[in-house]
């Protein structure tokens, strides 16, 4: 049998590193279909830190796409597992027959599914991508994204799968004994990416709580974002006093990020699509409820796991937040499907499906 090849077709260092390390540490030892990767970006020590994997790096999307298409045409039994699909050339290859549906398996990351960019080239490309998506052999996604995808592509097979968020299962009970009183701290957004709509989110938080809460905005990723960070900071200072606004411009190490999250009473995410599942997982693990946009279908995954969900359209106050904290504290977090190690079973099944080992 031909070994499955995994494709990370865009240079997104943080996510790509997470996926590679997860496969190296959790999957490669037990499956030959978890070892071969084609990745856009620089090695930057990844080969050394992932010795169980065979990783081929490419300088750009186009060179990777050309290599994938060549492999697909040379051997029609060759299957590919695309992790997040932000590579237009690969979509066009699927649409034109360069890559066959039986060769194309796609794990949706969220941003690659929704049509939120307003630029002309995106608006011209989206209809073609939609046509190509009808030809995918199987999609893997959160419950909410599967539901969203099925509305336009009901005939494409869909399987539940969660991004492998880095988590320490021993921390699942860390929030149960915590004192929750005093001024609330609210986390706004999951990164410095503009998709977080930071300024609109800050205004929404201020409308709900006024200048009575402390707001923390993590913006250390992506890099080279200074102008937008300053724009968010100035907008925040028009709403909140200086002591109640903390805009973080430096990238935090994982343990420091966990410490930051544990100081929060609430996470506030205004974006209208599934994203930031890693931050959501870490907040929920710490017993911190989250406010979501009703258009973000991840609320379906949360309610399926019996987790409290607050919405941006709700009338929020401290009593409601504290009640959500109480409800979250009563949940057995060891049973949550999108937590580590529970998502591992979904990955093992996804590999078997994509490799053609199970129907």
UniProtKB/Swiss-Prot annotation:
Is Glycosyltransferase among the key words of this record? yes
The subcellular location is:
Cell inner membrane
| One GO term describing the cellular component | plasma membrane
Give GO BP annotations, semicolon-separated.
Answer: enterobacterial common antigen biosynthetic process; fucosylation
The metabolic or biological pathway listed in the UniProt record of this protein is: Bacterial outer membrane biogenesis; enterobacterial common antigen biosynthesis
Indicate whether Phosphoprotein appears among the record's keywords.
no
Q: Which family does it belong to?
A: Belongs to the glycosyltransferase 56 family.
Name of the protein? TDP-N-acetylfucosamine:lipid II N-acetylfucosaminyltransferase
Give the species this sequence originates from: Escherichia coli O157:H7
């Amino acid at each position: 049998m031909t070994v499955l090849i995994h494709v990370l077709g865009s240079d997104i260092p943080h996510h790509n590193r997470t996926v590679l390390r997860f496969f190296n540490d959790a999957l490669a030892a037990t499956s030959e279909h978890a070892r071969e990767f084609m990745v856009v970006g620089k090695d930057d020590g990844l080969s050394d830190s992932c010795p169980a994997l065979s990783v081929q790096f490419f300088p750009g999307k186009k060179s990777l796409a050309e290599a994938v298409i060549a492999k697909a045409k040379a051997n029609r039994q060759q299957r590919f597992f695309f992790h997040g699909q932000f590579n237009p050339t690969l979509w066009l290859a699927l649409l034109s027959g360069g890559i066959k549906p039986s060769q194309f398996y796609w794990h949706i990351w969220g941003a690659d599914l929704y049509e939120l960019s307003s630029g002309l080239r995106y608006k011209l490309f989206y209809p073609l991508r939609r046509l190509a998506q009808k030809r995918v052999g199987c999609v893997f996604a959160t419950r909410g994204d599967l539901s969203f995808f099925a509305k336009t592509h009901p005939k494409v097979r869909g399987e539940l799968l969660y991004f492998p968020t880095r988590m320490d299962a021993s921390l699942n009970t860390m929030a149960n004994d915590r004192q929750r009183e005093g001024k609330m701290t609210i986390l706004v957004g999951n990164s410095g990416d503009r998709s977080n709509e930071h300024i609109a989110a800050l205004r929404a938080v201020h409308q709900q709580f006024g200048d009575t809460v402390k707001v923390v905005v993590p913006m250390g990723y992506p890099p080279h974002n200074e102008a937008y960070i300053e724009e968010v900071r100035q907008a925040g200072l028009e709403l909140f006093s200086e002591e109640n606004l903390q805009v973080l411009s430096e990238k935090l190490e994982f343990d420091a990020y966990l410490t930051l999250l544990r100081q929060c009473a609430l996470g506030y995410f205004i974006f209208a699509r599934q994203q930031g599942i890693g931050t959501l997982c870490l907040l929920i693990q710490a017993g911190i409820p989250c406010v979501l946009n009703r258009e973000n279908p991840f609320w379906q995954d949360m309610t399926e796991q019996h987790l409290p969900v607050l919405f941006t359209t709700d009338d929020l106050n401290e009593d409601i937040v504290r009640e959500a904290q109480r409800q979250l504290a009563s949940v057995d977090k060891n049973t949550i499907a999108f937590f580590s190690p529970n998502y591992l079973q979904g990955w093992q099944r996804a590999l078997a499906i994509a490799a053609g080992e199970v129907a």
